[in-house]
Structure formats: structure tokens, C-alpha cells
Design a protein with these regions (language model features):
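Residue-level recognition of the GNAT/N-acetyltransferase active site
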Residues: 11, 99, 132
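Active-site rim helix/loop that mediates acceptor-substrate recognition in acyltransferases
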Residues: 27-55, 62-83
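Short hydrophobic/aromatic beta-strand element in the GNAT-like acyltransferase core
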Residues: 46-50, 62, 95, 128, ...
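A short beta-loop-alpha structural element at the N-terminal edge
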Residues: 4-18
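Conserved acetyl-CoA-binding loop-helix of GNAT-fold acetyltransferases
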Residues: 98, 104-117
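Conserved GNAT acetyl-CoA-binding A-motif
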Residues: 112, 118-132
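Conserved catalytic-core motifs of GNAT/GCN5-like acyltransferases
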Residues: 67-70, 128-130, 140, 145-161
Length: 166
């Protein structure tokens, strides 16, 4: 599987692909807005990890976040890129997106693993994310710890806050 993909930071000309993938992977109440996605890619492309299908040259999925010294996930991270401190000791993961045709092949796990290794090498201490109840077990298999119900009410949903310690 790994040999079929190139893993790297996102390129500015891939913003439209990222927006389209986000809208496929998340319902409208949870998806990142095109404006916020464009701002994230413009400001911190290095905090994206994309998986490019070598056979098509197109994005198959990606993981993105914002760096901060904060230790608690809050909804404003989704919408306010100015909260990002590129030198922050932690990363708040904002979205793990894998197109449906690439699911079930271990790509999500590979993205989380490679992202965590890269950010650990960059001096990050912890990765945080929020997820719905039905995704908790998947993220536990990826090595994250469930911290319980999050303060987040993003999209009108109840979320679990999870952490991966470096």
C-alpha cells in the first residue's frame, strides 16, 4: 500500500482538491469551509500531510492541523488560523480525510503514523484531535488515548477528545 502513495506536505495548487475531499469526507455541519481550508493551506502547508496516488497524481487523502502550546482542543482552531503558532509544542489535528475508494487499505493509519513521526521529529510533544463516538476505537488502534467527552460542540455534535503523546 505504502508504495502506491507519495507522502508530503500539500502544494498551494492542491487547495481545490483538498476542499473537494473535505466535502466528500465530512457532512456540511462538520466540514471545514472552503475559506478556512484555503487560509490553512496558504499559512501552514507544512502542517498538512497528503497521500498522493502515484498512478493518478491526485490526492487520495490528507491529515492537517495547527500547532499551538495549548493543551485543550477548542472549536476556534477550526476557523481561526491566527491561533496557529508554527513553533507550538502541540498539534491540534483538524481533519483526517481519506476518499471512499481508498478506505480499508490502511491509508488513514499510515497518515496518522507518518504525521506523528514527522511532528515528533519537529519537536512536537502531543497531537490532539476530536472525533465522534464511532471513531474512538479506530483512533485507539492508531495509538491515541481517549480523554473523554470534549468541550467541542463543532457541527452540533458530541465529540471525544483524544491525544497521542510523543
Amino acid at each position: 500500500m505504502k508504495d502506491n502513495f507519495e507522502f508530503r506536505s500539500i502544494n498551494p495548487d492542491e487547495v481545490e482538491q483538498a476542499i473537494a475531499i473535505e466535502q466528500i469526507c465530512f457532512p456540511p455541519n462538520e466540514a471545514c469551509s472552503p475559506k478556512a481550508m484555503t487560509e490553512r493551506i496558504a499559512k501552514v502547508p507544512q502542517l498538512f500531510l497528503v497521500a498522493v496516488d502515484k498512478s493518478t497524481g491526485k490526492l487520495a487523502g490528507f491529515l492537517n492541523g495547527v500547532a499551538t502550546d495549548e493543551e485543550k482542543f477548542r472549536d476556534e482552531f477550526f476557523t481561526d488560523i491566527d491561533l496557529c503558532d508554527v513553533n507550538g509544542k502541540n498539534v491540534m489535528l483538524l481533519g483526517l480525510d481519506v476518499l471512499p475508494e481508498y478506505r480499508g487499505q490502511g491509508l488513514a493509519r499510515e497518515l496518522v503514523y507518518r504525521y506523528s513521526q514527522r511532528e515528533k521529529a519537529n519537536g512536537r510533544k502531543k497531537l490532539f484531535l476530536t472525533c465522534l463516538e464511532q471513531k474512538v476505537e479506530m483512533y485507539k488502534k492508531f495509538g491515541l488515548q481517549d480523554l473523554g467527552i470534549a468541550d467541542s460542540t463543532w457541527g452540533g455534535e458530541e465529540w471525544h477528545e483524544m491525544v497521542l503523546k510523543g
